[in-house]
Amino acid sequence: GTLHDIKCDNMIDQFHKNKDKQKVIAKKKLGVLAVVSGNGWKELYEKLHCDVISGGQSMNPSVQEISLGIENGHYEKYIVLPNNKNIILAAQQLQKMLGDKVNIIPSTNPMEGLAAAMEFSEDASVEENMENMSDRMKEIHSASITTAVRDSVVGKTVIHKDDYMGLVKDHEVVATNDLHDCLEKTIGNITTENTEIITVYYGDELTEERCNKEIE
């Protein structure tokens, strides 16, 4: 069909126009911006004094949404934690527009991002923080457990609807109808004899009592 009322905005110009309209507030030099989904992750990151933007259910915020998070934030420069491989590209596009105001630690999930955020120091330089946070993130072995929404086959694994699925990079998918079994096998895929700490984060579908029971 025919397009009407087409409006094109230059995002860099828009960034500076909106900035001029803001009230003048004292911003600190350097901080962390994390993209998260869910109030639980939001609370954990905010406890570490990170600015947070919601990635929504799809974890797919636009470049403009990330830009607004920076524009309306508490810091002059940011280390951005995308926490999803699909968001890394959007963060990189924003970095091209805003230059050294944006620095990226390419976290692919909120567990990696949280570990990196714990290493942030407001007394350290951008370069020192980038190095320390990146090194910490590389030490993390993460996994996620979800439920299958349909019957499927992934690699050699047959998955049935409502099965628990354990997802670990470079490993076959764990699929079973028993949560404890899935948890045990999935943890086995990310741990070694040198593993010292295992942290389990759970969502609304699981109570604290059920979680504690399953990890015993």
Label every model-predicted segment:
Residues 1-216:
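N-terminal loops that bind phosphate or other acidic moieties
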